[in-house]
Amino acid sequence: MSISSLSRKNIQALTPYQSARRLGGKGDIWLNANEYPTSPDFNLTHRTFNRYPEPQPQAVIEGYANYVGVTPENVLVSRGGDESIELIIRAFCEAEDSILYCPPTYGMYAVSAETCGIALKTVPLTADFQLNLPEIERQLTGVKVVFVCSPNNPTGTLVNRTDLLALLEMTRNKAIVVVDEAYIEFCPQATMVTELKNYPHLAIIRTLSKAFALAGLRCGFTLANKDLIEVLQKVIAPYPLPVPVADLAAQALQPAGLQAMQQRVQEILQNRTALEADLRSLPCVENVFQSDGNYLLVKFKDGQKIFKTLWDQGIILRNQHSALMLENCIRITIGTAEENRRVIEAIRKIA
């Protein structure tokens, strides 16, 4: 008997999420994980490594609450946004329940549900990467949690606000709606935070991994009404944030840290505009999809060839060819101006 055969049946059948690091690669240009290209500079100020950390570090909770304009009771901090996804599924889904999500989108919604033994329902996005609301409404029976990513990863599109409000109305008293705003700093006007007061079943996922350039910290947040946060507090690990992580996260949420984040956002937006224009000039490019994130989804005439050739040159992008509706598509994280120049130069040589 193998050890694997002793594991739960759903785990035996599970295909793990293929993160950028799991997929590997060797090179000096990494534009496959929607990270910021350089690291911010912080120094540890707390060195009480012999003591367990605060269950919910006050400086982090208050700093993030002030940043987004809510009260501390509306904030839960976790080990990245991925833990928020799993917490919500564990806290709200019974064995007979389902989650619903809309591909092509972030893969961890499905993986987290499958890990917990929860069934999946999918309603693909429309041709313009928006919600298919009539079909979602038809599929809601037995659904306890609906996940929507806006801006959506990997397409970069914002979900129409009117559609999100319609979704919240049709799920009232039926299901939790989770809006994943991992990339919202690149389009802050689109946040759903102002709707928390109107919808007790709305949860919003945030992170320090993208615009804050702190992917290595693994620090995320759930924003929701007090009652929903209290449910999640029942199932979260006792000490989710190590002392060094809480220390650096709190610094990032101070005025100087927020100003640096906003400067990074402006830099990324400028580089995104330039990269988009350069990509559109290439004959091998069929489409560059409009993006509100720190990445571009690009459809090539032969995406597989482009991806493999650049991979072999040490330029690591994210292949989306196998994702629903994304044949020959590659997602390109916005890098430095020099990194973007090298991407264009490499693609131009192939074409």
UniProtKB/Swiss-Prot annotation:
It catalyses: L-histidinol phosphate + 2-oxoglutarate = 3-(imidazol-4-yl)-2-oxopropyl phosphate + L-glutamate. Pathway: Amino-acid biosynthesis; L-histidine biosynthesis; L-histidine from 5-phospho-alpha-D-ribose 1-diphosphate: step 7/9. Homodimer. GO terms for biological process: L-histidine biosynthetic process. It comes from Pasteurella multocida (strain Pm70). Pfam families: Aminotran_1_2. The lineage of its organism: Bacteria, Pseudomonadati, Pseudomonadota, Gammaproteobacteria, Pasteurellales. InterPro entries: Aminotrans_II_pyridoxalP_BS (IPR001917), Aminotransferase_I/II_large (IPR004839), HisP_aminotrans (IPR005861), PyrdxlP-dep_Trfase (IPR015424), PyrdxlP-dep_Trfase_major (IPR015421), PyrdxlP-dep_Trfase_small (IPR015422). This is Histidinol-phosphate aminotransferase 1.
